[in-house]
């Protein structure tokens, strides 16, 4: 009977061990991951969906302006001296309007942004500060004409002198609020035929930085008013219900799967997320690059994996922008399709390291870079006497991603807007200025998740830790049970095969007594 029970115990222990191995190697992890992934996919009843539709916290939108302190010297050919003023901090609120759902696990939406000035975070800076900056809109108009029809540049400049009030040189004295959102008034009143053509061109193309002035024959120029309280899109994005590892990928923008202005499928590809949501990361297949689609520059940008880092006591993957993202075609031949002739009359259109031509995207000869030309060509710095100093800590773009949920714990995007200052002999405002790339301002857009969400993530990671402990505990118990049952079976078999005779030792009664005949 003892042997039979031991064998049953051994069999049950083996089954228990097999179950423990299956659960430990596959089952527990899959059950927990499935529950976590159910919460991160964009299903209407998931936590992530609610937070994705309306961000639970505002983003920090910071603007740093390059104030020109030696205008007269620059007008005479001297190197610019710049003074960085900022940050002017705004709270950026984001909300999405759902338009519908696609057949391929996609969701269509419009994105609305709203900006509010944050005086506390801005410190002593106010929107009434008056600064001197490069005259972006004037130079954009003049350079466009100079590149396309140089013979008309003097005629158009006369019209621009009427369009822009108090146009003395290539610099603008302006209040911060007017430069950013309220707008600088451009008057189309006048009898100059060239002015009529210029205003007609603006009216027909209406660049993002221009808007029609209500009740008058003119326009307002501002850098960001087109972003405020207006919707962009529609975007079409994968929800991650069918495959959570595709969550957040943008598949189309404004109904297009490729940005046509670059004339090339590689440069025009729309891939990656909108930077607000990423898919979970497989620990055995960590992506070397992550992509985000940036409609403001009409392209996708990638960041490279650096390493694994801890943030807020949470293990994350840290990515930062690669120097090849804005590399010259000599360093990254794939970027050759971003080359467009506009930078100067005898330039092939392929810009220096660290620059991106925005003319095809914005309709104006703007050039993007990282702040202070970080990761750009050293040649760009030679143009300035002082005030431009790239610094990785201040000017890098990066993101920390939780691999379990894909949630961004902290991230910052930074971008600088520049325009060419070009010497044109027959234009009074430009006849003596040094030719070079002139920065106007740079932006920092980022956020760090609040403590409440940090705690949720820590709890998720703790749960995985508990599962790991439970896995090994279950395996240990199963192995001990198998060993114990195996020993019991072995001992039972030994008992059954033990020799039974008169000289044997009884484990119950003790040794038998043998009678000895001593004789007479």
From Swiss-Prot:
Localizes to cells surrounding the sensory neurons in the antenna. Associate in a ratio of 2:1 with the neurons expressing the other subtype SNMP1. InterPro entries: CD36_fam. The chain crosses the membrane at residues 8-28, 469-489. One of its GO terms (cellular component) is plasma membrane. The keyword Cell membrane applies. Residues 1-7, 490-520 are cytoplasmic. GO terms for molecular function: scavenger receptor activity. GO terms for biological process: sensory perception of smell. Keywords: Cell membrane, Disulfide bond, Glycoprotein, Membrane, Olfaction, Receptor, Sensory transduction, Transmembrane, Transmembrane helix. Glycans are attached at residues 44, 67, 104, 228, 271, 313, 342. Residues 29-468 are extracellular. It is a multi-pass membrane protein. Disulfide bonds join 267-337, 298-361, 339-350. This is Sensory neuron membrane protein 2.
């Amino acid at each position: 009977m003892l042997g039979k029970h031991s064998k049953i115990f051994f069999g049950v222990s083996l089954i228990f061990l097999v179950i423990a191995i299956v659960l430990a190697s596959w089952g527990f992890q899959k059950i927990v991951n499935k529950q976590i992934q159910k919460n991160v996919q964009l299903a209407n009843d998931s936590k992530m969906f609610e937070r994705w539709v309306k961000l639970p916290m505002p983003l920090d939108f910071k603007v740093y302006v390059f104030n020109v302190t030696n205008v007269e010297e620059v007008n005479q050919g001297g190197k610019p001296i710049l003074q960085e003023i900022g940050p002017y901090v705004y709270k950026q609120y984001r909300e999405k309007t759902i338009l519908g759902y696609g057949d391929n696990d996609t969701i269509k939406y419009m994105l609305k942004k709203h900006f509010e000035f944050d005086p506390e975070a801005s410190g002593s800076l106010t929107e009434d500060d008056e600064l001197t900056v490069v005259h972006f809109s004037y130079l954009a108009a003049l350079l466009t004409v100079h590149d396309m029809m140089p013979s008309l540049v003097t005629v158009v400049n006369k019209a621009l002198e009427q369009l822009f009030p108090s146009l003395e040189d290539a610099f603008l004295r302006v209040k911060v609020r007017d430069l950013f959102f309220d707008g600088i008034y451009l008057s189309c009143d006048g009898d100059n035929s060239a002015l009529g053509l210029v205003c007609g061109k603006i009216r027909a193309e209406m660049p993002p930085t221009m808007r029609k002035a209500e009740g008058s024959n003119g326009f307002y120029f501002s850098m960001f008013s087109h972003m405020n309280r207006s919707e962009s899109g529609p975007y079409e994005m994968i929800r991650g219900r069918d495959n959570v590892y595709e969550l957040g990928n943008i598949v189309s923008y404004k109904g297009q799967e490729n940005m046509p202005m670059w004339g090339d499928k590689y440069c025009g590809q729309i891939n990656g997320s909108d930077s607000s949501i990423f898919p979970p990361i497989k620990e055995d297949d960590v992506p070397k690059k992550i992509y985000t689609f940036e409609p403001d520059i009409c392209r996708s940008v990638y960041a490279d994996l650096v390493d694994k880092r801890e943030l807020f006591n949470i293990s994350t993957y840290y990515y930062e922008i690669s120097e090849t993202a804005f590399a010259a075609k000599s360093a990254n031949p794939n970027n050759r399709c971003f080359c467009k002739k506009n930078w100067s009359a005898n330039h092939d259109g392929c810009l220096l390291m660290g620059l991106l031509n925005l003319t095809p995207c914005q309709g104006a000869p703007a050039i993007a870079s990282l702040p202070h030309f970080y990761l750009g060509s050293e040649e760009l710095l030679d143009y300035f006497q002082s005030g431009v100093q790239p610094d990785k800590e201040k000017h890098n773009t990066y993101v920390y991603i939780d691999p379990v949920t894909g949630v961004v714990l902290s991230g910052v995007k930074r971008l600088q807007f520049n325009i060419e200052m070009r010497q044109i002999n027959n234009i009074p405002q430009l006849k003596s200025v040094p030719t070079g790339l002139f920065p106007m301002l740079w932006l920092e857009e980022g956020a760090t998740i609040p403590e409440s969400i940090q705690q949720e993530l820590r709890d998720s990671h703790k749960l995985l830790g508990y599962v790991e402990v439970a896995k090994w505990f279950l395996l240990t118990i199963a192995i001990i049970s198998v060993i114990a049952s195996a020993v019991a079976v072995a001992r039972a078999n030994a008992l059954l095969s033990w020799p039974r005779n008169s000289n044997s030792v009884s484990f119950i009664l003790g040794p038998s007594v043998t009678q000895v005949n001593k004789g007479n």
